[in-house]
A protein has these predicted regions:
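Conserved Nudix-box catalytic region and its N-terminal flanking loop in Nudix hydrolases
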Residues: 17-55
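Nudix hydrolase/Nudix homology domain
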Residues: 32, 99-146
Length: 146
């Protein structure tokens, strides 16, 4: 018998405020990106998403809608569930993991986010409509598979 595949589950979110700005966090390794984090055992995707957003940014979200599911096929394999959401409440509060948290325009987000995986996630979310999308990618080197 072979080992069962093990995938890391990640929830990520493009959050917009009333001025239509996007919330970005700056991770100490990956640079600027959307708030995201691992889904812990026993958590629903929405609970994990809300928890990660609050931990990394100090804000709460509303109207979270699943828009894009990404499959990372390279080890460690991961499924990344990407949502669009609205800012609900709270003050921007950096964390140890994300020392910078800022609202910015779509254009500024495009300039700040340099990691190709994170850039493609933002583009997919910005281009999303009411249909759920599926994308897959590999790393080393980074390449989209569909």
């Amino acid at each position: 018998m072979t080992d069962q595949p093990k995938h890391i589950l990640v929830a990520s979110c493009l959050i917009r405020n009333m001025q239509n700005q996007i919330l970005l966090v700056k991770h100490h390794i990956r640079g600027w990106e959307l708030p995201q984090g691992r889904v812990e055992e026993g958590e629903s995707l929405i609970f994990a998403l809300s928890r990660e957003v609050l931990e990394e940014t100090g804000v709460t979200i509303s109207h979270a809608k699943l828009a894009v599911v990404w499959s990372k096929v390279s080890a460690p394999a991961a499924m990344i569930f990407c949502f669009n959401a609205r800012y609900a409440s709270g003050e921007l509060t950096p964390s140890e993991e994300t020392p910078y948290v800022e609202w910015c325009s779509e254009a500024e987000a495009g300039r700040r986010v340099s990691h190709p995986t994170n850039r493609d996630r933002i583009i997919a979310l910005l281009e999303s409509d009411d249909t759920l999308q599926f994308r897959s990618y590999a790393t080393s080197p980074y390449r989209l598979l569909n």
